[in-house]
Amino acid sequence: MTYIVLDLEWSQPVCREKMRIAGTRVLQVEIIQIGAVAVTDGIVSEDFFSEYVRPRYYTELKGRIKKLTGITKNDLKNAHDLTVVLKSFRKWLEKFGKDVIIVTWGPDDIPTLVKQCEFYERDTGWLPEWF
């Protein structure tokens, strides 16, 4: 069994009026980094995943986000968009086979990832079981 410890960082609209809406889908936050490490048989792997994501809509980082994450606008300037980073993350996950469970530090990471995929009309069927 391999546990993937996932941590997402995200940006927010600067105000409620700037929140992005597409039909019935609302983009409350936008992922700006995906980080993960594998733990197999209680051993933390040296193999990890960490990529910045270039935001499409919430490009202005609030001071609180910069302070909390240490991520700057410059870090995101040359990053790939979410679609490309998700493909890379999915490929990274595949090396661990089917016996994988995703765990997170908090309750928001997986729902945020799922909502982002839904907003951008991306499949979520590839996501392994998660807690």
Predicted regions located by residue number:
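Conserved non-catalytic scaffold segment of RNase H-like nuclease domains
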Residues: 2-111
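Substrate-recognition/cap helix-loop segment adjacent to the acidic, metal-dependent catalytic center
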Residues: 108-130
